Structure formats: C-alpha cells, structure tokens
Curated annotation (Swiss-Prot):
Name of the featured protein: Non-specific lipid-transfer protein 3
Keyword Secreted: no
InterPro entries: Bifun_inhib/LTP/seed_sf (IPR036312), Bifunc_inhib/LTP/seed_store (IPR016140), Plant_nsLTP (IPR000528)
S-S bridge residues: C29-C76, C39-C53, C54-C99, C74-C113
Key word Cell wall biogenesis/degradation present: no
Signal sequence residues: 1-25
One term of GO molecular function: lipid binding
Pfam families named among the record's database cross-references: Tryp_alpha_amyl
Keyword tags: Disulfide bond, Lipid-binding, Signal, Transport
Length: 117
C-alpha cells in the first residue's frame, strides 16, 4: 500500500512539473512514471534491481529517441526525484547502468534538462 501511495505521489508530481512545460515531446510524465513504477522500491530501499524495473528503463530509453523526448523524460525524472524525499540519489544516478542502458545525462535532482541532446 505504501508503494502505491509513493507511486501516486510520483505520478502527481510529474504531472505538475510537466504541465506548464511547452514542448514538442511525445512523451508524457505519466508514460515515464508508468515505465519506472517497478523501480520505486529499488530507488527508496535496499535490494537488487527488479527485472520489471530494467524492462521499464529499456522501454523508456527506446521511446525517447528525439531531443525533445529526451529532455521531457529528463524533466519528468528530475521532478520525480525531487518529489520523493526518500529516493537514494546514488541509486537513481546508477539505475540506467545497472539495467545496461546508456542515457546521455545523469539522473539527479539538479540535472539541467535543457542541455540534454
């Protein structure tokens, strides 16, 4: 139940952050958070990366093919990181590598998403 509450907060935070952002991106924060929902436990607790989490990371990476999409995904991730006070920032930053995915920016609470190409 606590995980569902955290996920709901994550989705709401992403929607609030992404709402006023004008962009040509096809990705929504709902899509981003939906793909990464299985990662919440890993990012806030100890334990291995769930297979479903890595599937979501890979899927999201495959969807974010254009610069606007990558920037939007970045904004959603930064918003989510800031909305989850219990997030382990080191785990968040290392999540793509842990899943064997290479993204062109570091996931953190302070990433400048406008510089993502």
């Amino acid at each position: 139940m606590a995980g569902l509450v955290k996920l709901s907060c994550l989705v709401l935070a992403c929607m609030i952050v992404a709402g006023p952002i004008a962009t040509n991106a096809a990705l929504s924060c709902g899509t981003v958070s939906g793909n990464l929902a299985a990662c919440i436990g890993y990012l806030t607790q100890n334990g291995p990366v769930p297979t479903a989490c890595c599937s979501g990371v890979t899927s999201l990476n495959n969807m974010a093919r254009t610069t606007p999409d990558r920037q939007q995904a970045c904004r959603c991730l930064v918003g989510a990181a800031n909305a989850l006070p219990t997030i382990n920032v080191a785990r968040a930053a290392g999540l793509p590598k842990a899943c064997g995915v290479n993204i062109p920016y570091k996931i953190s609470k302070t990433t400048n998403c406008n510089s993502v190409k």
